[in-house]
UniProtKB/Swiss-Prot annotation:
An MF annotation (GO) of this entry: toxin activity
Biased composition (Low complexity): 37-52
Span(s) of short sequence motif Conserved undecapeptide: 532-542
Name the record gives this protein: Streptolysin O
Signal sequence bounds: 1-36
Subunit structure, as described in the record: Homooligomeric pore complex of 35 to 50 subunits; when inserted in the host membrane.
Membrane topology of this protein: Multi-pass membrane protein
GO BP of this protein: killing of cells of another organism
Source lineage: Bacteria, Bacillati, Bacillota, Bacilli, Lactobacillales
TM ranges: 263-276, 283-292, 361-370, 378-390
Record family assignment: Belongs to the cholesterol-dependent cytolysin family.
Amino acid sequence: MKDMSNKKIFKKYSRVAGLLTAALIVGNLVTANADSNKQNTANTETTTTNEQPKPESSELTTEKAGQKMDDMLNSNDMIKLAPKEMPLESAEKEEKKSEDNKKSEEDHTEEINDKIYSLNYNELEVLAKNGETIENFVPKEGVKKADKFIVIERKKKNINTTPVDISIIDSVTDRTYPAALQLANKGFTENKPDAVVTKRNPQKIHIDLPGMGDKATVEVNDPTYANVSTAIDNLVNQWHDNYSGGNTLPARTQYTESMVYSKSQIEAALNVNSKILDGTLGIDFKSISKGEKKVMIAAYKQIFYTVSANLPNNPADVFDKSVTFKELQAKGVSNEAPPLFVSNVAYGRTVFVKLETSSKSNDVEAAFSAALKGTDVKTNGKYSDILENSSFTAVVLGADAAEHNKVVTKDFDVIRNVIKANATFSRKNPAYPISYTSVFLKNNKIAGVNNRSEYVETTSTEYTSGKINLSHQGAYVAQYEILWDEINYDDKGKEVITKRRWDNNWYSKTSPFSTVIPLGANSRNIRIMARECTGLAWEWWRKVIDERDVKLSKEINVNISGSTLSPYGSITYK
């Protein structure tokens, strides 16, 4: 019933619309008839014809039109309207097109400069990267294993770095090319920069390959990633064809190393995403935090050439004049995320080396550093022992990485060969983007990520159980006092000291006498005293040995000998 009612209403309004249209037509007819009657009256005066038709009066015409409209209103038939396209639509299209052309011709250079210069921000704050915050940790822990006692010591450390060259990974090369525009926001600090894509002015770029002179600089009309990459490829090919002289180009090497304690710490120390290191080198951060492993990472950045983009005198120099600040705002530009300009990109390869050991020696870092610097560690027994119980991994990113994609070995000489191999630029060993530097578009100040992080430096020291060998060969009566502490740690890392003493302290011993006193691996503060009876009334007892800080060793040999008036004592270690 409701549908039927709607149809009737629709028909009624259709008839009303038709009636209005008909009224307009009738009005035109009445006007036309009136003009026709005037014409006929004029003709009557000059004709001789006796029979002249009487024109319909306007009243009659109106009456017929009214009757027709009533019939239309009372009819159930739909009135179809077919409006014609008005010529005005075409005119509106032309007008809109003209307005668009005017907008594209408008110069917004002054507006862009004013707005970017007026951006209010702190360079260090907008690019601050706050890593881990350490609240609770166990400062010390003791672990007993057979004849070993391992002390794991943890210290809270802070690291604050501001690197200006940022490592490039494959996923961001399309937004870290020379002259690219970026936002100084969280994404930039995490090596995932947000690009600002808009209409650009032509941009000059320069490559620092030797011998090219003026040919080393070209202008890219539309500096997109594809166009800039093509221009760089052309420059490199020109150098190979015309300026290399068939020679290779040695790399400029930058080297950094650091022990690994946590993800945020190694990111800040080496300026590289820990996920890349973890994925390529397989760093076991859990074992490191437990003190079970010690790991050092070295990064060799081998640069073949650098491509620089000419810095703009004013911010608007990089934009087409049609670009508005409103458009830049829509794409993220603000006080919290000011625009950046990629000023240069280094091309070459990066070699990451992981040195890993389960040794608890305090000389691990020194041994690893010596190996990386090419020092002959075979002459140093401690270093040699550490390296013999270590494993090494090298990963090459960029250049001819297929040859040495990942190498795992126990022989560090193999790692040295990986570092040296393919360290020269040639057609067979091409360069890849490895790092870039950006500047703030407002003032061309270098944009450095301000890394602030806390981390726990974990060191582990391994102690082995020992013993004291007492030997009395003197011509006198002797007495001993042997004391030591046994160290443990509670669940909060607090040191717990248990006092220990030899059961035969102060017992008189005649020569020859010998015995063995076992010491646990957690023994500290060892004191050894031996005295002899002189028989002299004024000096009945005389000390032969009195050592209060004897170090724990596998064997501590305590020997006393001589006569009452000339005793002799010594402590040796084995």
